[in-house]
Regions:
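Non-catalytic, mostly N-terminal accessory regions of nucleic-acid modification and defense proteins
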Residues: 1-143
């Protein structure tokens, strides 16, 4: 299952003008996977806090959370087909999401925080996927 998904992602990235090698495929797949993992982690922490009567504050602002920009769902749980795609998705990722995540490095309380680590990761990354339609396909496969 996972092997076929990664092969499908590689096939999509192979078609993209911004990804010229297997190293690009790995790097681009990694940042998308990381954001999905981070969203799942925050959801788990939120659930655990609710079960113990505590509150949890997400480190990612609502408008930058996976469920908002990457995989918005309708009330019935199905994918919202009005989600960002094409140039809208690329503009959001390149001009809003990445700059937002890079700022975590300077705004974190210390280097030992997850915020700092997120900022460090995204200060070294660049979205190389040039087609917002290819990026949408990759995001959908990872979701």
């Amino acid at each position: 299952m996972f092997e076929q998904t990664f092969k499908n992602i590689d096939d999509i990235l192979h078609k993209d003008a911004g990804c010229g090698s297997e190293l690009d495929y790995v790097e681009q797949t990694s940042w998308v996977l990381f954001l999905k993992y981070l969203d799942d982690l925050e959801n788990d922490k939120q659930t655990a806090a609710e079960l113990t009567g505590k509150t949890y504050t997400n480190i990612i602002a609502p408008e930058y959370q996976w469920a908002v920009w990457a995989a918005p769902k309708l009330n019935n749980g199905k994918i919202d087909h009005n989600a960002f795609t094409g140039d809208d998705l690329l503009d959001f990722v390149n001009q809003k999401l990445f700059p937002y995540l890079k700022k975590f490095k300077t705004s974190a309380e210390s280097a030992n925080t997850i915020e700092y680590k997120v900022g460090e990761i995204f200060s070294e990354l660049k979205n190389r996927i040039q087609s917002g339609y290819n990026l949408r396909e990759v995001v959908n496969l990872i979701d």
